[in-house]
Structure formats: C-alpha cells, structure tokens
C-alpha cells in the first residue's frame, strides 16, 4: 500500500509526450531537475516551442516504463550534438540513432526505470514515448 502522503506517479501507457516549457514537465509521469532555457527554440511536428530544459550538468529527466517503448528526444533547432546519457550509458552504447538534421535522438528502451542526463550540453524540448509492437 503506497504512503497516502506520497502521490503516486501515473503509469506511462500508450503514446506519451512530455514538453519542458519553463523547465517543467508537462506530464506528471516525468520528474525533471534543472533550469529552463528560453534563448533557444525547437519546431516539432509544425509547433514551435520557445522554452525547454537546459540539458547541462544540472539537467535530468527521470521516468519509468512497464513495456518496451521507442523514445525520441527533441533538442533545440541549433543544437549540434543531440546526445544523452541513458542510465549513465553514452548514446553510442545504447544503440540510439541521432539525427542532427531533425535534432533528435531515438532509441528503443526495455521496461525499466530511466534517468536521462547530459552527455553533451544541449537544450531538450520534448520526449515522446511510443509502445513497440512485436
């Protein structure tokens, strides 16, 4: 039985997105640390975001998934390196695909708890999780 004083984190189900306007997670399934950036922007699926999360030594995003999902991280339009440490592993160690034209990092994640932290300094605007159908 959960402690009634501790709100439970909603389970991530189906396709989920989380933006970081003001440096705050738009989805309560995600825990964010760090500060906002409003000096950069990102255009994602036709929508321009003017505020995101500084992905520096203080920035991190944590979440849990109960099934295999594809994660896409969307970085600022002028970020040259779209990388992240995923549970301490470098992008090259996770099988992630970085697209520096679209400013994304995409990787398949197994059911687990995840913490995303800085590999190279950047600006994170959105995370999208999509269930993998096998």
Predicted segments — roles?
Residues 1-13:
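Ser/Thr/Gly/Pro-rich low-complexity, disordered linker/stalk segments of secreted
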Residues 59, 67-71, 111-113:
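Short tyrosine-centred short linear motifs in exposed loops/low-complexity segments
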Residues 72-76:
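Short edge beta-strand/loop segments characteristic of extracellular beta-sandwich folds
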Residues 79-90:
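Short, surface-exposed beta-strand/strand-loop-strand elements in extracellular ectodomains
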Residues 10-58:
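Glycan-recognition and processing domains
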Residues 115-123:
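Short beta-strand-plus-loop segments that form exposed binding edges in beta-rich domains
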Residues 89-111:
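Extracellular carbohydrate recognition and processing domains
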Residues 44-67, 78-81, 101-105, 122-126:
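Short beta-strands within extracellular/lumenal beta-sheet-rich domains
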